Amino acid sequence: MNAILKVCLFAAGLAMGQVVLAQASPVSSQLVAQRVEMVAGKPVLKAAGDGKPGDVLQYSATYRNTGAAAAAKLLATVPVPPGTTFIAASAEPAQAQASTDGATFAPMPLTRMVKLADGSTRKEPVPLSDYRALRWEIGTLAAGATTAVSLRVSIDAPVVVSAAKP
């Protein structure tokens, strides 16, 4: 498995662990990363294996309530790892909120205010490459019930830094 994919899986795993610990409930979660391949014009999920720039990965998180009572106010959060770009309209279910810092979430598409040269401000879309997590408000998950969320990302090309010549 190449380094880019390893970093993506590691970062995603850390974020998933933090979500479950923060909830302190009998809800367990499992995050799976799979490569998306187009076969006869339809997406097919394959083992992630080695990833390269331009590859599309799907992160699917499954939440299961193993307790005897319903779990209320469940939030499902899936990270968008560094080195990847969220793919617009790939969130399932679609009503996810997004974040650029993993802490503050808002409905998609995200926007921000930008100060222009003349001192005025303008609202502009946040680039999808700046999205760092998606969150779904699941609400109540009945005892024994399972729910799943997913998103897709593309692996970014590595950033090449070259020294300037004097």
Name each region found by the language model.
Residues 2-3, 21-166:
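Exported/extracytosolic protein signature
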Residues 5-12:
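Sec-dependent signal peptide hydrophobic core
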Residues 12, 17-19:
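N-terminal signal peptide c-region/cleavage motif recognized by signal peptidases
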